[in-house]
From Swiss-Prot:
GO terms for cellular component: nucleus
Biased composition (Basic and acidic residues): 192-202
Disulfide-bonded cysteines: none
Cross-link (Glycyl lysine isopeptide (Lys-Gly) (interchain with G-Cter in SUMO2)): K172, K176, K193, K430
UniProt name for this protein: Zinc finger and BTB domain-containing protein 8A
Organism lineage: Eukaryota, Metazoa, Chordata, Craniata, Vertebrata
Length: 434
C-alpha cells in the first residue's frame, strides 16, 4: 500500500532542516551570499550538481562549496525553494533569469515550466491585442451613436421611402440615389494642377467621416413635399463640391454598408505584426522568429556539435562551426570519402593530378604492394631529368600488358606507349602525324 503524502512530508522535513541549517553538508556561494543545502538533494535535482558532486565523491567527509557568478542570489533562491518544496515562484520579471539559471544547472523540469509560462503570457498578449482590434473596428462617435460607413451620402440607397427627392427617370438612374442631374448642378471651378500639388490639405479635408448631424438623407413629410423640393435641390448642390473633390477609390477598395465596412476597407498592416516579445520591444511577423528571438533572453542553446559538444542557439551557426572548424583542411579519400591520415592513406600522383587514397582503396585497385624504397626505385627507373611524367611502378608482366595502342579516329593519330628515351619517341611519333 502506497501513501502518497509520505513524499511531500519527507520533502517538508528536508526543507525545515535546510532552513534551520541541520545536517547541511554543502554550501553554495552566489555573489557573496551563502546558501546551505544537502548534497543528496542537490545531486538528485540538478544535472550540474550531479556531475560536480560525482567528481568529489571520495571527499564525502568534508563539506562541499560551490561558487556561481552567472546568476543573482534572488534567482537561486527561487530555484532552491523549488528543489525543496516543488513550488516555482515565477513572475514576468524573473522568468528569463530563472530559465537561464535552470539551463546552466541542467534542470529540465524548471526549463519546461518557464517555457509554458512564457507561452501563456504570449497567448494573453495575443488575446488582448485581438480585443483591441475588435474594439477599433466598432467605430463609434463620442456620444455613443454609431457612425455611418464611408461615402454613405452618395452610395447608400434609400429604400422604402414614399417620396423621393427628385422624380425618378428611367433614363437617368442616378436620380434614385439623390444625386441631381447635370442640368441642375451649378458649374464648379475645377482645381488647377499646381493648386492640387501645393494645397493637398484643402483636398484632404473633404475625405472624412460625416458626423451624425451632417448626413444628407432628407425625407420630407406629406405636407412639405412641394415646399421643400427646392430646398433639397440647393442642399444637393451644396453637397456636390464635397463629393466631386473626393478622390476616386482604388481598384482594390471595397464598398460595404454596415459596421464591418470600415474594418474591411483598411489594410491589415497593423494585424500582421502580431508577435511581440514580452521582455523587450522586438516585434516579428512569424512565431518561429519569436521563438528564435526568445533564446537571446533565455540563453537556450538547443543545437549541440556532435564533434566537440559545443552548443549553439541557431542551426546555421552550428553548420558554419562544423564546416570551418572540423572540416577545414580535412584529408579524405577520393574514392570512399572517409577521413584519412598520413598513416592510413597515401598520396597518389597520376600525371599532373594528385589525390589521396586510403589503404583499403589502394588494396582494391591492386596497389597494396607499393615498394618501401619508392624514391630509390624512382631514381633507377627515371628515363631522364627533363621527363616530368610520373608512371605507376608495376611489375615486368604488368608493364608488358600495359603497353597498348590508343587510336583516335578523329585525327587518325596512333600513339604507342613504350619506355624509351625522348629522342626515340620523337622519331617514332613524327612520321605518324598527318
Amino acid at each position: 500500500m502506497e501513501i502518497s503524502s509520505h513524499q511531500s512530508y519527507l520533502l517538508q522535513q528536508l526543507n525545515e532542516q535546510r532552513r534551520q541549517d541541520v545536517f547541511c553538508d554543502c554550501s553554495i556561494l552566489v555573489e557573496g551570499k551563502v546558501f546551505k543545502a544537502h548534497r543528496n538533494v542537490l545531486f538528485a535535482s540538478s544535472g550540474y550538481f550531479k556531475m560536480l558532486l560525482s567528481q568529489n565523491s571520495r571527499e564525502t567527509s568534508q563539506p562541499t562549496t560551490a561558487t556561481f557568478q552567472t546568476f543573482s542570489p534572488d534567482t537561486f533562491t527561487v530555484i532552491l525553494d523549488f528543489v525543496y518544496s516543488g513550488k516555482l515562484s515565477l513572475t514576468g520579471q524573473n522568468v528569463i533569469e530563472v530559465m537561464s539559471a535552470a539551463s546552466f544547472l541542467q534542470m529540465t523540469d524548471v526549463i519546461s515550466v518557464c517555457k509554458t509560462f512564457i507561452k501563456s503570457s504570449l497567448d494573453i498578449s495575443e488575446k488582448e491585442k485581438d480585443r483591441y482590434f475588435s474594439l477599433s473596428d466598432k467605430d463609434t462617435g463620442s456620444n455613443g451613436v454609431e457612425r455611418p460607413p464611408f461615402y454613405s451620402s452618395s452610395w447608400q440607397e434609400e429604400g422604402g421611402s414614399p417620396h423621393s427627392h427628385v422624380s425618378p427617370d428611367p433614363g437617368k438612374p442616378w436620380n434614385k440615389y439623390g444625386y441631381p442631374p447635370a442640368s441642375q448642378r451649378s458649374p464648379q471651378r475645377p482645381l488647377a494642377k499646381h493648386e492640387q500639388r501645393k494645397e493637398p490639405s484643402k483636398k484632404a479635408k473633404h475625405v472624412r467621416l460625416p458626423q451624425p448631424s451632417e448626413v444628407v438623407h432628407f425625407k420630407p413629410g406629406k405636407g412639405e413635399a412641394q415646399t421643400d423640393s427646392g430646398n433639397h435641390v440647393s442642399q444637393s448642390e451644396e453637397q456636390v463640391p464635397v463629393d466631386a473633390e473626393v478622390d476616386p477609390a482604388p481598384a482594390g477598395f471595397q464598398y460595404s454598408q454596415g459596421p464591418d465596412g470600415i474594418a474591411r476597407s483598411f489594410p491589415d498592416d497593423l494585424t500582421r505584426l502580431r508577435f511581440k516579445c514580452p521582455f523587450c520591444t522586438h516585434v516579428v511577423k512569424r512565431k518561429a522568429d519569436l521563438k528564435r528571438h526568445l533564446r537571446c533572453h533565455t540563453g537556450e542553446r538547443p543545437y549541440p556539435c556532435q564533434a566537440c559538444g559545443k552548443r549553439f542557439s541557431r542551426l546555421d551557426h552550428l553548420s558554419s562551426h562544423f564546416r570551418t572548424i572540423h572540416q577545414a583542411c580535412k584529408l579524405i579519400c577520393r574514392k570512399c570519402k572517409r577521413h584519412v591520415t598520413d598513416l592510413t592513406g597515401q598520396v597518389v600522383q597520376e600525371g599532373t593530378r594528385r589525390y589521396r587514397l586510403c589503404n583499403e582503396c589502394l588494396a582494391d585497385v591492386g596497389m597494396e604492394s607499393l615498394p618501401a624504397d619508392l624514391e630509390a626505385e624512382q631514381h633507377r627507373t627515371a628515363p631522364a631529368d627533363g621527363d616530368k611524367d610520373c608512371r605507376w611502378h608495376l611489375s615486368e608482366e604488368e608493364n608488358r600488358s600495359y603497353v597498348e595502342i590508343v587510336e583516335d579516329g578523329s585525327a587518325d593519330l596512333v600513339i604507342q606507349q613504350v619506355d624509351d628515351s625522348e629522342e626515340e619517341e620523337e622519331k617514332e611519333i613524327k612520321p605518324n602525324i598527318r
